[in-house]
Amino acid sequence: LTAQIVSRIEQLIDAGKLRPGQRLPSIRKLAAHHGISYHTAVTAYEQLVASGRISAQQGRGFFIDSHAQPRQPGMSSVASESENSPLGSFWRLFHGSPELMKLGCGWLPPAWRDTQALARVIRRTANFSKSALVEYGDPLGYLPLRQQLCLHLQRKLSLILEPQQVLTTLGATHALDLLIRLLVAPGDHVLVDDPCNSNLVQLLKLRGAQVIGIPRRIDGPDLAFFAETLAKWPVKAFFINSMLHNPTGSSISASNAFQLLRLAHLHDLTIVEDDVYADFGNGHSNRLAMLDGLERVIYVGSFSKTLSASLRVGYVVGPARLIARLADLKLLTMVAVPGFCERFVSIILGDGTYQRHLVSVQHKLRTHQAMALEAFRQWGWEAFCEPQGGMFVWVRHPQVTNPEAFVQEGVEKGIVLVPGSAFSADGQPSPWFRINVAHFDATGASVLFKR
C-alpha cells in the first residue's frame, strides 16, 4: 500500500496536478481518504521526503517541494538525468516504476524466481559456512563450485575439464571485462555481433579498441563479411553469442559454426563465446566451445540471469595458463568473488533446486514466446526468426519509421522499450526492437504495438 500511495502522489506531481509549494493533506486525512493505517501514511510521506518530491515543514505539514520537477511516467531522477547518454534507454529499465511493462529489459520477472527456495538455500549457506560471511575467497574461485561447474559443462557441452580451467567472476560482465583487459590493447581491432550486447561495445570502446560489427543472420554471423574483415584487418578477437543471441534470439547453425571455426583457425583468431542465456534454451546446441574443444574458444557463462541478479556469479572457461593470468588480474581488481555467493550457487547446483527451477522457467518461456510471436504476427510485425528458446524476439513493423519516437510513445503508455540502435555496434539507426517475452502481456502490449 505504501508503494501505491507514493506512486500515486508522484504521478500527480509529474502530471502537474500537484504543483511546487502546494500543501498536501495531513497524515490523518491521507489515511482516512485511502483507508490505510496511520503508520502507512507516515511511511509514504517519509519516502517522498527522502526522494526529494515533498518537504516537511515543522507545525505546518507536508508540501510539494519547490525544487521538484515533473518527470516522465515511471522515471526516477537518476534515469531522467541520464536518458540522453549512450546508455540512456537502459536507465528506464533499471529505474522505472514497477508498474511499467519492461519489454526491453534483459532479465526474468521477479515473480518467475522461486524466492522461497532461494531464501532456504541462503539460510543453508549461512549455516554451512560462517567463514564465507567474513573471509576473502580463493581468487580462482571456490573449489567445490569449480568442480561442480566442470560436471555441469561436461553434461551440457561434452567438455572434459579440470578445475584449474575454470575461474569464477562477479557475473558475465565482469568476465568480459577481465578478458578485454587481458586480450585487447588500445587500437586493436575486435569483432562483435551486429547487433550485440551494448555493454560489450562500451567496454571495448573504454579499452580503446577498434570495434567492427559482423552482421548477424538467422543462422549466425555473415561469413562472407567475416572472411573479408579477417583478410583486411589484423583482428585480435571475436566476441559472440552463438546460441540464443542477444538481441535477435537466433542460434548458429552447425554449418555456420564449422566454417567460422575454420576461418578463425586460418587467421589465428581468439573467440570469446558469451553464453549467459545458455540455460534458457531447449537443448539444441552448436556451441563453439563444444565444437572447438577450447582450442581457441574461451567460454563465458553466468547464473545471474537464471538465479538472481543480486547474487552475481559468473565464470570463464579456457586453457589453464590463460585462467591463471585472468586470476592474477582478478586479484588485482577485486581479489575474489564473495565466498557466500559462490557457496550459494554450489549448494543450489548440487541439491537439484537449480534444475527444477530451469524446467519451470523454460516451460514458461516457451509458452510466452509462442504467445508473443502470434500476437506480433496478428499485429503486422515481422520477427527476425523463431528462436529455439530463450527470452528474446527481435521484431519490426513497416509503419514504425521513427524508433525513438515509438520508444517515447511506449513510455507514455507504460511500456519501456530500447531502440535497436542501442544494440548496434556503431550506433546506426535500426527499425528493430528487442522484446523480452517473459514480460509480455498481449492485452497490455496491444495499446502500443497494435497498428
Task: Please provide the spans of the model-predicted regions.
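Conserved core of the PLP fold type I
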Residues: 132-267, 279-292
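Short, Asp-centered acidic motifs that coordinate Mg2+ and/or phosphate
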Residues: 236-237, 269-270, 298, 313
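Conserved glycine-rich beta-strand-loop-beta hairpin in the small C-terminal domain of fold type I
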Residues: 363-373, 383-396, 411
